């Protein structure tokens, strides 16, 4: 099987209000939001990071929310307990030889990432891999545009987590409606027409 992994920033409030934000401060500090940096948008933000793993068809198989300051590579430690004997394709945020070796030795998971230009043993990116990876980017775009996943008015951490889970569930239901009606799974905007 082949899967694609990526992450998306979920902003809780603006960076200037980050120190005054009360979300996650009352209870478990391990779930409190944190400051992070999004390399693709070249911005700092205060909140969480949504990690998702999807298949070739575009259905999300696994997801997790972590603090914004946590590196993308840490999500792969959770994946190795759930999946085995598969290939996972990620972006440059998932480069790490020790993690790739650990995933392969423990669960026979091949983690494929494009090389950085200044990396030793550089090889060009395999074009079909780059085209297929657009699937998870499309899912994140659909979550942002049609389900407004980045706009959240939750006051507590559990409320935010529940809203994110609800939006991912709604996306999956619309994909299933398209599957039943023999329509392309990715066209969720017109699923109920």
What spans do the regions from the language model cover?
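A general structural signal for well-ordered alpha-helical segments in protein cores
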Residues: 73-76, 136, 140, 166
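Short, solvent-exposed polar/charged micro-motifs at secondary-structure junctions
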Residues: 11-17, 122-124, 163
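Structural motif
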Residues: 42-43, 154-164
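Hydrophobic (often cysteine-bearing) scaffold residues that line and stabilize catalytic clefts
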Residues: 72, 132, 161, 165
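Charge-dense polyanion-binding interfaces
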Residues: 27-35, 162-171
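Polybasic low-complexity intrinsically disordered regions
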Residues: 1-92, 96-105
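Helix-centered, glycine/charged polyanion-binding patches within enzymatic domains
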Residues: 87, 92-158
């Amino acid at each position: 099987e082949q899967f694609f992994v990526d992450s998306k920033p979920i902003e809780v409030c603006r960076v200037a209000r980050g120190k005054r934000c009360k979300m996650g401060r009352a209870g478990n500090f391990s779930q409190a939001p944190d400051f992070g940096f999004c390399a693709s948008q070249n911005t700092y933000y205060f909140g969480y990071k949504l990690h998702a793993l999807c298949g070739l068809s575009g259905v999300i198989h696994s997801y997790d929310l972590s603090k914004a300051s946590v590196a993308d590579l840490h999500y792969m430690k959770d994946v190795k307990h759930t999946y085995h004997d598969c290939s996972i394709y990620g972006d440059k945020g998932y480069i790490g030889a020790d993690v790739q070796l650990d995933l392969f030795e423990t669960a026979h998971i091949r983690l494929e990432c494009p090389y950085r230009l200044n990396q030793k043993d550089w090889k060009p990116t395999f074009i079909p891999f780059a085209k297929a990876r657009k699937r998870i980017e499309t899912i994140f775009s659909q979550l942002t545009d049609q389900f407004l996943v980045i706009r959240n008015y939750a006051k507590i951490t559990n409320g935010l987590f529940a809203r994110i889970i609800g939006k991912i569930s709604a996306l999956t239901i619309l994909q299933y409606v398209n599957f039943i009606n023999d329509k392309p799974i990715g066209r969720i905007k017109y699923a109920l027409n």
